[in-house]
């Protein structure tokens, strides 16, 4: 009964420190009414766990005259073996030899209880440790005292985090913060340079386009000038308008703008001409043919050259502004009719 109760208590509460002392109290209560209490206590004091088998053999080989005493010793040793062997002998007084116990007057203290180094106690101890405070305290001590970043605690929440993967380097120390700020400032300084360089390139491209556009109509202006001189030589255009326009490239360039073309067309309509510019052009050609029959070949050649040159200029203008085809034709007709 005693052994079963001890076993059940030990299994139910493995972390209880009183379970080892319960065995001794039960044995002492069992032996309290016996007359041989002093004798048993002396035997228990001289008992050694390592030499228990030898002591049992010596008790069984004793003389027959001490039969009663051998019975009592055998019964008590059996009762003693029913106890928990791994824990109870640590609290007994048998580890010290009998000679030393008899000679020494100092009280003998029991040896400290062994800690069961199994998995359950280890897990229990680890679960009771604080993770956050210990990690912060260990990290602070290690950083200031030992100049080490790695914390000493195994339960640190910041241990082994790859900060370079999550972009957390600038939060680790002030030096990295300063480096990050320096990089940002350098990027801010380089970005205006690029922004300034791009408008310069754009302006250069714009100037190149203007230069190309200014150089493009020069050939056409020379052709128009030659055509005008031919028309003046044959009396198609009055020579009063020539000195004002000859050598002035801006005038020819201004004539090609849509606003000037509109103004010229509206001015022709406001003058009250009943006939269209195309009709006036045809009439002028017919009158010239009737007035000078001798020079018919020259007039036809001039007319053909004019008709050839007019589509050339109109095509160039149509390529630029195809929607303003009617205004261009009206302006050309009005210029040649004058």
From Swiss-Prot:
Residues 50-70, 267-306 have a biased composition (Low complexity). It comes from the Eukaryota. Residues 50-72, 267-318 are annotated as: Disordered. It holds the Pfam family MBR1. Residues 307-316 have a biased composition (Polar residues). Keywords: Phosphoprotein. The modification Phosphoserine is found at residue 119. Belongs to the ISF1/MBR1 family. Could influence the NAM7/UPF1 function, possibly at the level of mRNA turnover. Participates in mitochondrial biogenesis. This is Increasing suppression factor 1. It comes from Saccharomyces cerevisiae (strain YJM789) (Baker's yeast). The lineage of its organism: Eukaryota, Fungi, Dikarya, Ascomycota, Saccharomycotina. The gene is ISF1.
């Amino acid at each position: 009964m005693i052994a079963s109760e001890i076993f059940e208590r030990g299994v139910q509460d493995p972390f209880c420190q009183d379970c080892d002392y319960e065995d001794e109290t039960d044995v002492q209560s069992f032996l309290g009414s016996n007359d041989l209490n002093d004798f048993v206590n002396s035997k228990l004091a001289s008992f050694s766990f390592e030499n228990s088998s030898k002591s049992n053999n010596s008790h069984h080989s004793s003389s027959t005259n001490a039969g009663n005493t051998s019975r009592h010793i055998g019964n008590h040793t059996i009762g003693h073996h029913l106890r928990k062997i791994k824990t109870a002998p640590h609290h007994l007084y048998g580890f010290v030899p009998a000679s030393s116990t008899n000679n020494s007057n100092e009280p003998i203290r029991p040896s400290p209880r062994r800690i069961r180094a199994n998995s359950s106690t280890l897990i229990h101890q680890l679960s009771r440790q604080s993770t956050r405070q210990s990690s912060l305290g260990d990290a602070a001590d290690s950083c200031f005292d030992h100049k080490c970043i790695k914390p000493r605690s195994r339960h640190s929440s910041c241990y082994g985090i790859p900060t370079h993967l999550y972009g957390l380097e600038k939060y680790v120390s002030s030096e990295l913060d300063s480096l990050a700020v320096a990089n940002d400032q350098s990027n801010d300084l380089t970005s205006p340079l690029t922004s300034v360089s791009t408008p310069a390139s754009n302006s250069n491209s714009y100037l190149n386009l203007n230069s190309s556009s200014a150089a493009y109509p020069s050939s056409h202006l020379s052709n128009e000038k030659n055509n005008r001189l031919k028309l003046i030589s044959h009396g198609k255009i009055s020579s009063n308008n020539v000195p004002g326009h000859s050598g002035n490239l801006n005038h020819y360039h201004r004539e090609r703008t849509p606003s000037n073309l509109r103004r010229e067309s509206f001015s022709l309509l406001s003058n009250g001409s009943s006939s269209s510019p195309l009709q006036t052009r045809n009439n002028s050609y017919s009158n010239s043919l009737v007035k000078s029959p001798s020079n018919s070949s020259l007039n036809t050649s001039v007319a053909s050259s004019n008709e050839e040159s007019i589509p050339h200029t109109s095509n160039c203008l149509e390529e630029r502004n195809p929607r303003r085809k009617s205004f261009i034709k009206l302006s050309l007709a009005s210029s040649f009719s004058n």
